[in-house]
């Protein structure tokens, strides 16, 4: 973390940072692909025979912001994710799970994860996890594929005959949202669900 903080590199230019992370993983016995996924500062590190039932990608972020360094905390997030991958690799047999550490650069701009998804990099993983800092001391888990969001619609009452233009019909807004979701649903692939 200290090395990354002392050598901030902006999105897509994380050459020394990615090199340091890869060197650390190699020193711990990981085999690495570097560069990876067509990105000069990305990597994938695999520990052991890679023959367990499940596969987990531990994602690391390590880019800095222009002019202000690691204000988003990727120096810590990346280091913690790296250490989590190293620690989990020691119990792969008990978990029946292969642990792969995947470097995801350029998260403050384009977001390398999006391009990696489009390339199918994550298709063979059962789960992808990562650490990111927050302004509170807590553990927070969100499964984006299983998110449930509640929307509340509020209207404004008015007299239907004397001044309907002063009112706001919450049901109209709710119906527009439901119709919009229904239009999007037709574009979803079979492995995605969008319910309303």
Tell me the role of every PLM-derived stretch.
Residues 1-96:
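Acidic/His- and Gly-rich active-site-bordering loop/insert found
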Residues 41-46, 63-71, 75-76, 82, ...:
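Histidine/acidic-residue-rich, glycine-tolerant segments that coordinate divalent metal ions
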